[in-house]
Amino acid sequence: MVYAFKTAGAAAEQLKNLEDVTRIAQKTADACHSVGAALTSCTIPQAGKPTFEISEEDMEMGMGIHGEPGVWRGKLRTADEIANEMVDMLLADINPNSGSRMSVMVNSLGATPLEELYILYRIVKKRLEDVKVKIVMPLVGRYATSMEMTGVSFTFCELDSELESLLQAPAYCAFWSVV
């Protein structure tokens, strides 16, 4: 969603017609692959209670940003183990060619501090370098949170020249600055 907003916004800024902006937004969405891992739930204000329960010793892999169930729930793992499993899932989905270009987002789901995100990014960077994927414009921070959830999501956005150009186009806002 973040990548689609950026590329569609850049296309609109270039005065592309609505059909082109829509095409670019869809192309970007199709190029994005995400997976999340959570250590805690979040509380949606309208509900007033956590969206799901999870013990302090457990985690959930593959859950959705709104608390949708993941692919497995089990014992908490190390940051490196979590990052490696998430990268494995994304690479299996994408199967990139050597020389592919991707933007990578390591996103806090709300309560995960920046320092921990950089620990996870270290694994992402190494793993993509190992398969000869060039990382373009890495993003590490809070881009799409789930209230106070402790967790992380990884998004890999496959880039061609059109999407890369739009992603790197100037943007000036509190959320995203490219100069």
Name the predicted role of every residue range.
Residues A10, R23, K27-D30, S34, ...:
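Charged/polar, solvent-exposed surface patches and flexible loops
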Residues K49-I119:
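Glycine-rich phosphate/diphosphate-binding loops and the adjacent beta-loop-alpha structural elements
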Residues H33-G36, Q46-E53, E57, M86, ...:
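Short alpha-helical interface elements
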Residues M89-V179:
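C-terminal non-catalytic interaction/assembly regions of soluble proteins
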Residues V2-Y3, K16-K27, E56, R77-E85, ...:
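Conserved active-site and cofactor/substrate-binding residues in soluble primary-metabolism enzymes
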Residues M1-H66:
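Internal, active-site/partner-interface "lid" segment
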Residues K27, T40-A47, T51, D80, ...:
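A sequence-level detector of short, solvent-exposed, charge-rich linear segments
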Residues E13-R23, I54-I65, W72-A83, K132-S146, ...:
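Hydrophobic transmembrane alpha-helix bundles
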